[in-house]
Amino acid sequence: MPETYPYMKGPFEPSFESLYNFHCPDWFRDAKFGLWSHWGAQSVPMYGDWYARNMYIEGSDQYLYHLRHYGHPSKFGYKDLVKLWKAENFDPEELMDLYVRAGAKYFFAQTTHHDNFFNYDSKLQPFNSVNYGPHRDIVAEWRAAALKRGLKFGITEHLGASFEWLNTNKGCDSHGPYAGVPYDGNDKRYEQLYLDNAEYLDLSKPRMHYTHDKRWPPRWYECVREMVDLFEPDMLYSDGAVPFYAKGATIYDPTYESGLKMVAHLYNGSAAQNGGANQRIYFQKDSRPEFFRIGLLDIERSLEDDIKPLPWQTDTCLGHWFYDVRAQYKDHRQVIGLLVDIVSKNGNLLLNVPQRPDGTIDEECRFTLEKIAQWISVCGEGIYGTRPYHVYGEGPTRLNADKRDKAIQSALRTLAPGATIYNREADAQWTPWDIRYTQKETEGKVYAFVMGDARAVSLTQLKEPEKVASVRLLGCGSVPFHTEGGVLSAYLPERLPCEMANCLEIVTRP
């Protein structure tokens, strides 16, 4: 009898205990900053996230938008919308040049979102970007462009949640001229896209992230294995906890079988290519150590409040996940502040750049990336290849989780049990006293990022300030300093090389 979940054998077994032998590769700890294309057919309306679900929820903003722009979802559904995605101006070579200039050391491409439409030449899902819409293998093109420039390449899969998420297309309007007329998701001819999940449609109940339907884990597994085998990614990201989390499940529960075998398959594939050493990373969002230690923890739009003993990653976006003409963007100052704060706490930042349906990014995104590129060209030395100092920083400003919004907090916990509280990412008001530290210990260097606008800087958290041999302002040169009472004082020129987060390189004597 064939295995339900065939996986490559090797040093990693499909158990939590075996996968605890994962060690984060140094390349990721050195890289610090990645960019992400969270892009697909849902970008067509340019009207935000979760469009393929919400267009079937009567009265929702996206339902009304769809009704007025495309027609009723019984007549013009998501199967029709995917055909409008053309990506006619998509130039991964030009975009990747920009992303490298902006400082990205790794890149993620989305293989499929919860919409169950695949962005590559899948042999398992006919509803894909080669057969419909662009008629291009989007993921393969991204991969080629990234590897050509020496970037590590990752894929994100959001398929685990699709079975529950994509059931709204089985409904119908409750009132109005189309009352009782089934949405097109009820048409069995399109079940490969819309799925056989009508029995789970009940909008009066909270939505589960992962289904309990026994048919779905094998389907998820064969599709994600296809992705891993096709693209041999350095990183695999699951949008949720380890599949297939169920409430109350322990690390020994068989509900995790498909997820654990996928991680073992991922790692053993790398070990086979690297003399037994795994160089790949699996990301998921359950922040309980007994679960996330099989890879690295990813916290969506969230931050940590102190240095973490293990590397971790925040993923966020300049605007909304999918292109939205209404979105208010982060500016370069906010992104730089996030990056420095995250790196000071042993983390990496993964930033999504929203793309229009034609494949381009807008001028606001381009401007932001160019400004980040200017900053990284000056201060990147204090970011790449560094490790946390004994403290992450000093000063009054804290970027940590916003615990006030209980609704958002509750929603995130349905995505991943034990998840770090959602952070609203309000733009920090950095003061002249705010400092963030990194170090290259083997080189005897500490880096102090002066987050606010300051000319006289006092550093109170250096381990041995009396051993400081020199202080250099990156992008400028040596600056005068003195130490007294355990405090190092440095004096910066009136004209600073960067508009924020200027970086001091502090070299100590042995």
Specify the residue positions occupied by each region the protein language model found.
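Mature catalytic domains of secreted/periplasmic carbohydrate-active enzymes
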Residues: M1-P510
